[in-house]
């Protein structure tokens, strides 16, 4: 429950399609705007994913998925590598999707991906309906996450030829000016 109905609907897509339980309660400054609420939920969810995966021993690590939603086709590719990098190649034709500014969706994913310390590329190949475009992004992300976090019983160690997944730069939240 974030206080933003369309955003709650999108978060439900992550829970449903990644097969992860999400319980989110955010009491943000919605009287000002939705930006901080959406960004903070992304930061908190990304941090929770990173902590839940620990050293990532045994996970599949790499994943991709394509999702169709009527006329829309979206793909997501991710690597749970501890090196945050985000590409958002998604175009909508309206300033708002649901009750949200369209730019908030990339802000959400950027925050989540930074704190989860993953590399993630989300791209809509085509589509006309703005609701379908955004929802297919959330579903495609969720399916990729489900695959990437799946434990592979053949992998006994950390999924890296180096034997570790290190990232030594601090999170942008940890930066002190």
Where are the model-predicted features located?
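Conserved small/polar residues in nucleotide/adenosyl-binding loops
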Residues: 167-172
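Structural preference for solvent-exposed beta-strand-turn elements
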Residues: 1-166
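Cationic, low-complexity basic patches in intrinsically disordered or flexible, solvent-exposed regions
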Residues: 177
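Short, cationic motifs built from Arg/Lys/His that form the positively charged side of catalytic pockets
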Residues: 150, 173-174
């Amino acid at each position: 429950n974030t206080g933003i109905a369309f955003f709650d609907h999108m978060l439900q897509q992550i829970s449903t399609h990644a097969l992860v339980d999400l319980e989110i309660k955010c009491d943000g400054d919605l009287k000002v705007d939705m930006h901080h609420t959406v960004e903070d939920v992304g930061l908190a969810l990304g941090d929770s994913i990173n902590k839940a995966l620990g050293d990532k021993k045994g996970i599949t690590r790499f994943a991709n998925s394509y999702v169709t939603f009527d006329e829309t086709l979206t793909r997501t590719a991710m690597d749970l590598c501890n090196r945050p990098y985000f590409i958002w190649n998604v175009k909508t034709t309206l300033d708002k999707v649901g009750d949200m500014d369209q730019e908030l969706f990339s802000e959400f994913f950027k925050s989540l991906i930074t704190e989860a310390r993953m590399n993630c590329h989300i791209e809509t190949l085509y589509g006309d309906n703005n609701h379908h475009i955004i929802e297919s992004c959330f579903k495609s992300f969720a399916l990729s996450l489900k695959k990437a976090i799946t434990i592979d019983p053949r992998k006994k160690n950390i999924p890296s030829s180096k034997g570790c997944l290190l990232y030594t730069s601090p999170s942008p939240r940890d930066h002190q000016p």
